[in-house]
Amino acid sequence: MAKNSMKAREAKRTKLVAQFAEKRTALKAIISDVNTSEDDRWDAVLKLQALPRDSSPVRQRNRCNITGRPHGFLRKFGMSRIKVREAAMRGEIPGLKKASW
């Protein structure tokens, strides 16, 4: 079980990413545009660097909704492999059953 502070930190990162997404994409478009002058490009780079570090999407980590576990995360279910297995064994996930061959 992850600490509550880790879960809260991830929630904060998710909120920051959503808050600064438009500004970040606009600045990146200016930086990657070949017709932009060097001064404008440099200003955009400085503004991008001034944004909060946690507003970058690559700093986010997928975590289990139940336990907060960062490893073994299954995107389709939003849970770790352990909790998916437990829920499947209890029949809580429709259409999911244990494989047998």
From Swiss-Prot:
GO terms for biological process: translation. PROSITE patterns: RIBOSOMAL_S14. The keyword Transmembrane helix does not apply. GO terms for cellular component: cytoplasm; small ribosomal subunit. It comes from the Bacteria. One of its GO terms (molecular function) is rRNA binding. InterPro entries: Ribosomal_uS14, Ribosomal_uS14_bac/plastid, Ribosomal_uS14_CS. Disulfide bonds: none annotated. Keywords: Ribonucleoprotein, Ribosomal protein, RNA-binding, rRNA-binding. Pfam families: Ribosomal_S14 (PF00253). Part of the 30S ribosomal subunit. Contacts proteins S3 and S10. Binds 16S rRNA, required for the assembly of 30S particles and may also be responsible for determining the conformation of the 16S rRNA at the A site. Belongs to the universal ribosomal protein uS14 family. This is Small ribosomal subunit protein uS14.
